């Protein structure tokens, strides 16, 4: 489904389409909220109030792509709450811990067939919609703002969503005037560091430092030495076309692949997976070969799914001390159904959908260059 599919020709949200395609939406009115922050009652009531606030900002008969993203972000910002809401005996009220991450996964599933650039802006806004509540009270507000300035959606979009979220809440903890002042101060801070509406300029060590810890020696090399070689990190679901991209663009580069290593050590079958012990051995061999390539300053490509930020961080931890140029290549099939069809005899539909659910789009702090390729 595309984001435009949830809007009528007159620029209004088509709630019949939403309810028929997003089952979680039908659970919002049955999901309670903490009374101190949400006197409006259930999540559905709050969501409708936030949508009304956003409609005041961007609504109209003719909606731009920007308008549709912002209205969709307002509509789905709390879509993860039904699965995350629990009663806390300690707090004596309901909590919805990590609902922003659950919401991101739901939105990506629903709009997977949307253009990646549009879809990932929406996913980013849902995942980060809580961030502005905590910036000023954090240990390093400037660092947080610099990081957010480089996100998939800019700080203006994020603060607009957060302000609508605040205005759409009946809160005993923050008045509308206090919300407005908080957002104004964050905007001023973003402007002062050059990150209001555009990404902050960063050194390589600062950028990668948002993803992983770096030694002083690694920071020195990242900022003052020419990389001289490249590590490509492939990212994509099974069947997305990673092998095809490699053959067409970097066929001469040394390829490191878990599938190939599994074959080497005798794990047999169609798209086989070994025991835990065997898979640990596959990881050891791959990492050993990756480090060897880095020591020799040899271009290489890590050709696995690498859909989680955790796995990509493990790779970065190994390679950054050697100062390579890091290129992430994200390859996507036109639709999720295409992924399933291309690998139907090798990877089950259930596995692909599970991997899609755990997919995390690469962030700016994970690469020097991001290449996005959608297979036809």
Predicted regions, residues:
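Glycine-rich phosphate-binding P-loop
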Residues: 230-250
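Conserved GTP-binding G-domain of TRAFAC-class P-loop NTPases and closely related GTPase folds
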Residues: 252, 332-376
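ATP-dependent NMP and nucleoside kinases share a basic, alpha-helical "lid"
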Residues: 264-268, 306-347, 358
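Conserved substrate/cofactor phosphate-moiety recognition/catalytic segment
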Residues: 243-298, 335-338
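N-terminal pre-Walker A segment at the start of P-loop NTPase domains
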Residues: 189-226
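Divalent metal-dependent catalytic cores for phosphoryl transfer on phosphate-bearing substrates
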Residues: 60-177
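Acidic/His-rich, divalent-metal-binding segments that scaffold phosphate/diphosphate chemistry
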Residues: 1-87
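Glycine-rich phosphate-binding loop used to anchor ATP phosphates in small-molecule kinases
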Residues: 277-324, 330
